[in-house]
């Protein structure tokens, strides 16, 4: 099996090392793991692509590259340059430091990397490690993802959950903020929404008198819709969410047509 991995935390992020371990276990001794990841942190860039300026790329070692672009850029660089036409059997993006559940899905560069792979017709999974009070004292905050990651990915692969015609389908996996031994299992869950944790800004003043703003996110431990991804994560379960690139609110089409069509 040939596996391509990327992330949004950058080529030197500890979560990428976790993903490399997961990918190597899945690929087996006769497989290949290729890494093309951002040279610098790209958290929050979503599905951005760098089509207005060139993207520098450097080979760091065997099958290991750093690109000065987004996770989606990295997937494109791998498919159309690094791999020289060889198609990966699977694309994994992560393991993100922090959850990409609920509304975080819309901002996530980790999810954006998996989305680009799906648009290219490839099986893809985004993986993230939810952090919280129970992970703060761990020597390895990625313990849950490191221990259970390969098993969860293999579960999806063995069930043949990709339809060759549905090129936009991919999966979003979030590991709960608990030690590996405390994992309660996995749940298939819809994307949720934390109503009280939208982003805001914090105004500050520089020593030279210039005003600047920091983007501020809300608390990740806040309640969300029962049974959805963030909710089951906080209950100690891995969440597995099927996603598509199609953002159409299909349930509203007929109503809108009746009102204004």
Swiss-Prot record:
Cofactor binding note from Swiss-Prot or TrEMBL: Binds 1 divalent metal cation per subunit.
Regions crossing the membrane: none
Subcellular location as annotated: Cytoplasm
Enzyme class: hydrolase
Catalytic activity: a ribonucleoside 5'-phosphate + H2O = a ribonucleoside + phosphate
Pfam families given in the database record: SurE
Keyword annotations from UniProtKB, A to Z: Cytoplasm, Hydrolase, Metal-binding, Nucleotide-binding
Binding site for a divalent metal cation: 8-9, 43, 96
The protein's required cofactors: a divalent metal cation
Gene Ontology molecular functions: 3'-nucleotidase activity; 5'-nucleotidase activity; exopolyphosphatase activity; metal ion binding; nucleotide binding
Leader sequence residues: none
Database matches in Gene3D superfamilies: Survival protein SurE-like phosphatase/nucleotidase
A cellular component term, taken from the record's GO annotations: cytoplasm
Described function: Nucleotidase that shows phosphatase activity on nucleoside 5'-monophosphates.
Family annotation (NCBIfam families): PRK00346.1-4, PRK13931.1, surE
Family, as annotated: Belongs to the SurE nucleotidase family.
Protein known as: 5'-nucleotidase SurE
Organism: Cereibacter sphaeroides (strain KD131 / KCTC 12085)
């Amino acid at each position: 099996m040939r596996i391509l991995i990327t992330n949004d935390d950058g080529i030197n992020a500890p979560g990428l090392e976790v993903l490399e371990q997961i990918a190597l276990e899945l690929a087996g001794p006769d497989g290949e793991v290729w890494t093309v990841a951002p040279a610098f942190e790209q958290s929050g860039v979503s599905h951005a692509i760098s089509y207005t300026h060139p993207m520098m790329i450097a080979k760091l070692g065997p099958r290991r590259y750093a690109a000065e672009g987004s996770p989606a850029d990295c997937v494109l660089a791998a498919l159309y340059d690094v791999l020289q036409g060889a198609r990966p059997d699977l694309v994994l993006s992560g393991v993100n430091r922090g959850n990409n559940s609920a509304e975080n899905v819309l901002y996530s560069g980790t999810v954006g990397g998996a989305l680009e792979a799906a648009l290219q017709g490839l099986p893809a999974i985004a993986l993230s490690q939810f952090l919280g009070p129970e992970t703060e004292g761990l020597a390895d905050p990625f313990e849950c993802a490191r221990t259970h990651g390969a098993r969860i990915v293999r579960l999806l692969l063995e069930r043949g959950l990709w339809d060759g015609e549905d090129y936009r389908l991919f999966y979003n996996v979030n590991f709960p903020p608990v030690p590996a031994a405390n994992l309660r299992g996995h749940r298939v869950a819809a994307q949720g929404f934390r109503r009280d944790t939208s982003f805001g800004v914090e105004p500050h003043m520089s020593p030279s008198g210039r005003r600047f703003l920091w983007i501020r996110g809300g608390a990740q431990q806040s309640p969300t819709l029962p049974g959805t991804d963030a909710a089951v994560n906080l209950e100690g379960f891995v969440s597995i969410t099927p996603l598509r690139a199609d953002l159409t609110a299909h349930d509203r089409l007929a109503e809108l047509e009746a009102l204004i069509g």
